[in-house]
């Protein structure tokens, strides 16, 4: 816990570290309870690389142990967020957390055990980002929803996200105060505020509003409260997006992780679309037009050089042809 208190990272990252620490504690108690090692402890000074791999195997299989020993796990009060089958990327993150902790321990003289340096941490693996092409986006925008009026608001919300690249949490918070006289929408992303590290630069977003975005605001703005969109339950919004894209026949096959097996599988786009698909649509299509990450980051809230930004845009063959045309 002392490490979490002293490390200079965001609140979100600290929460991730605490989650890994809790897994370590459950692992120690599990070994004592079910494997007969009554005095088992994973001490920083004495653990071996085999102990670490045994811990990672425990984390990978904890969702199975949770079902088998449910009554025992009740003491940890994790019913609302029980263990699941984790992706390889998540498991690499757990390893990174442990390595960061041990780096801190050795740097500050709390341990001289270098076994953790034998850990191999593989790079994360992601499928290509899932987003709508401009043609698909406009097809959704112009589809006649007269017979499906319940989807009209969801369409406007989703399209607005496609046009300004905001997260759903920011979409719900927008008011007329976010709109400038020169036709921009300005805001500090909620995620940035929640995860801010003291002294770190903020990621203020300023995005021009095109005619489509202005039309959507005009249709939905509450003039009394100033809110740009009425609140809708996020689960209903997520469901509405899928129904909207199904109705609009946005059924191009894409690759995404199966939520149960965690393996990459092919799906029609409408089945895996979420509000975040709109954000990816904004980023990916702008990147095709203007391959300037810093310009795009100024509109999305990503920090320049952000690793996560790479997961939003896809360098396809058209991008490569455009690049080569510049040196012909």
Write out the residue ranges for each language-model feature.
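Short, Lys/Arg-enriched alpha-helical recognition elements, typified by the DNA-recognition helix
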Residues: 1-104
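Short, charged hinge/linker segments at domain and secondary-structure junctions
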Residues: 34-35, 46, 70-71, 103-128, ...
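Basic, Lys/Arg- and aromatic-enriched nucleic-acid-binding interface segment
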Residues: 81-96, 107, 111-168, 172, ...
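Catalytic-site neighborhood detector that most strongly recognizes the C-terminal catalytic loop/helix
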Residues: 131, 189-193, 234-237, 300-326
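DNA/chromatin major-groove-contacting recognition/catalytic segments
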Residues: 140, 197-198, 202-208, 219, ...
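Short, basic (Lys/Arg/His-rich) helix/loop patches that form interaction surfaces
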Residues: 146-148, 222-227, 242-298, 302
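Conserved tyrosine-mediated DNA breakage-rejoining catalytic core shared by Y-recombinases
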Residues: 164, 173-218
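Short, polar N-cap/turn motifs at the start of nucleic acid-interacting alpha helices
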Residues: 178-183, 291-311
